[in-house]
A protein has these predicted regions:
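Short, small-residue-biased leader/transition segments that mark boundaries at the very start
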Residues: 1-7
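Catalytic core of bacterial c-di-GMP phosphodiesterases, primarily the EAL and HD-GYP domains
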Residues: 324
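Short internal beta-strands
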Residues: 345-354
Length: 386
């Protein structure tokens, strides 16, 4: 679950924005234009004067190709129709409002290159593979030997001799290795100078003309460092989900949206992780990570419940509270007050343990809306059956 939960500390940008940054650092990218209408796509197609273009949905998620959000076209009629289709679709719940029209490139080979943080070695790690254009996680799972990894010493960085050594592991020819070394150095600069958490090119294409070109571009930033990079922060294009997460943060919650239908309200990140694991263990899918913290204020419970029920996919709510600083009777009072303000028929499973747990349970026991559980396992099973 760590990648899902930690995503609240990361800022993603669109492919077209990442390519603009690549261009500033001298990394070759294909000609492209951002468009928001089918008419705009046709105009861009004609301006490029090329036979083929690729139309790519611009949304802050992966899997665009599998969802039908990436299309190669070779005439204006297809370009117009495919753009209409893409602009009308939703990918992983995110509406597509803009597309990137790119010149189609004749590709001889595809490679994968990325820089990210390896928390085990506490260093930046360079990952490369000759199996580019594919899901790199799938490559790592099925054929891990195809991925080359190098840890970067932060005191040394990536001087010429190291860049060339790494480049030769993919390109034995001197000319191509030289081009690759330069790209590796510039990607590393992007990573370090912008406080990125991930810089990825997939694929990095070797064209039939012998040039190396970033066909796709992805950059993820650590939002804890954005105060140092106002120009990066200006690129932020929040999705509706991220707006909800930002609103939750303002209210003092840790909230991350997920794809399931069991809403979770928990106090403490560790208990939240354990609750989600328990739900998964018995075949359920959490709809969110929501940590209300250690406050004993019923108002926070009211706000948290409103936040959970904004998600139309939530079919049941599981509340798992360990009363230490948080008093279980205050949580119960907050729940009663919340449903005086909220018109919802969603069933609510409540597990209260710790400070004033018996008082909290008694407050809720007379209301059929609430189903009381005494253990985390019981709560998870009740949520699945609700």
């Amino acid at each position: 679950w760590s990648s899902d939960v930690c995503s609240s500390d990361l800022m993603k940008i669109h492919e077209y924005q990442a390519k603009e940054i690549f261009s500033k650092y001298g990394i070759p990218v294909e000609r492209h234009t951002l468009c928001r209408t089918a008419a705009g796509v046709l105009a861009a197609y004609r301006r490029m004067g090329t036979d083929r273009v690729v139309i790519k949905a611009q949304v802050l998620t992966g899997g665009r190709g599998k969802a039908g959000g990436v299309k190669l076209v070779n005439n204006t009629e297809d370009a117009y129709q495919e753009t209409k289709n893409i602009l009308g679709m939703s990918i992983k719940g995110l509406p597509v409002n803009q597309v990137l029209v790119s010149e189609a490139v004749d590709i001889a080979a595809e490679y994968y290159v990325s820089y990210t943080i390896d928390r085990n070695t506490r260093s930046v790690v360079l990952m490369m593979s000759a199996s580019g254009g594919m899901d790199i996680e799938e490559v790592a799972r099925q054929t891990p030997e195809k991925i080359i990894r190098y840890s970067i010493n932060p005191f040394i960085g990536l001087p010429d001799y190291l860049a060339r050594r790494f480049a030769f592991s993919l390109f034995p020819q001197m000319e191509q290795a030289g081009k690759m070394a330069a790209i590796l150095q510039e990607l590393y600069k992007i990573f370090v100078e912008n406080d990125a958490s991930l810089v990825e090119v997939n694929p990095l294409a070797l064209t039939k003309k012998g040039t190396l070109m970033a066909i796709d571009a992805k950059i993820v930033f650590d939002d804890n460092a954005l105060y140092r990079h106002p120009e990066v922060h200006a690129l932020f294009d929040p999705t509706e989900e991220e707006k909800v997460e930002a609103d939750a943060k303002d209210k003092g919650f840790s909230y991350v949206h997920m794809d399931g239908n069991i809403g979770c309200m928990v106090n403490g990140a560790g208990l939240a992780m354990a609750t989600m694991d328990m739900i998964k263990l018995y075949g359920g899918q959490p709809a969110n990570f929501l940590d209300i913290g250690g406050s004993s204020n019923p108002v926070k419970v009211i706000e948290a419940m409103k936040l959970l029920l904004q998600d139309e996919k939530v079919k049941v709510v599981l509340i798992n509270i360990f009363g230490g600083i948080t008093r279980c009777d205050d949580v119960a009072m907050g729940l009663l007050q919340a449903f005086e303000q909220i018109n919802s028929n969603v069933p609510v499973i409540v597990r209260l343990t710790g400070t004033n747990e018996h008082i909290g349970r008694e407050l809720l026991r007379n209301y059929s809306r609430f189903q009381i559980a005494t253990t985390m396992k019981e709560a998870a099973l009740m949520a699945l059956k609700a």
